[in-house]
């Protein structure tokens, strides 16, 4: 469930950020594209580092750290008055997503019995696919009906649920 929620947040935000950057911050198309893409740069940087730190600190501590940074960086979307701040928040949010998703993958791989590894990894992957199926739809729907601030508050609430579920 944690993986589904983490990826749902990713898909909710990725489809609305370019629109928000253009409409609210008057970004050009390339600036809006950077605001979307810089998230993945943060994710890649985190994944390059996360494996080493998981070996040192352990999966659970890295998951908690990732969720904490994810929570803080998601709440920071409320305070993005310019493109530089939005890009910084996006990078940090992507970094947190990279830590969290790497930790959850490692935890799942370590707890599934070898005899059911294929089945377990399949279900884990299914949670990602389900998030990809509903996240963009919900993001656009919510942006037009409830607004940007509601989506950010909703994502913060989902991260809190992830934190509760990871204990």
Describe the function of each predicted region.
Residues 40-44, 48, 132-133:
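Residue-level signature of mid-helix packing/kink "hotspots" within the transmembrane helices
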Residues 18, 131-143:
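Small-residue (Gly/Pro/Ala) motifs that create kinks and tight helix-helix packing interfaces
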Residues 156-167:
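C-terminal membrane-cytosol helix-exit motif in multi-pass small-molecule transporters
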Residues 73-77, 93, 166:
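MFS-fold secondary transporters
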Residues 89-127:
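Cytoplasmic helix-loop-helix junction between adjacent transmembrane helices
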Residues 1-25, 30-32:
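Helix-loop boundary and gating motifs at the non-cytosolic
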């Amino acid at each position: 469930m944690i993986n589904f929620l983490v990826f749902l947040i990713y898909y909710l935000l990725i489809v609305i950020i370019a629109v928000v950057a253009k409409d609210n911050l008057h970004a050009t198309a390339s600036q809006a594209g950077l605001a979307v893409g810089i998230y993945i740069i943060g994710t890649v940087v985190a994944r390059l580092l996360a494996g080493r730190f998981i070996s040192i600190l352990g999966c659970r501590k890295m998951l908690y750290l990732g969720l904490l940074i994810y929570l803080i960086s998601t709440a920071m979307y409320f305070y993005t008055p310019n493109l530089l701040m939005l890009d910084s928040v996006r990078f940090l949010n992507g970094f947190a997503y990279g830590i969290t998703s790497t930790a959850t993958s490692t935890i799942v791989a370590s707890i599934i019995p070898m005899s059911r590894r294929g089945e377990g990894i399949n279900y884990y992957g299914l949670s990602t696919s389900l998030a990809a199926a509903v996240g963009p739809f919900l993001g656009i729907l919510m942006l037009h009906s409830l607004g940007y601030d509601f989506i950010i508050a909703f994502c913060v609430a989902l991260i809190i649920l992830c934190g509760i579920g990871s204990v």
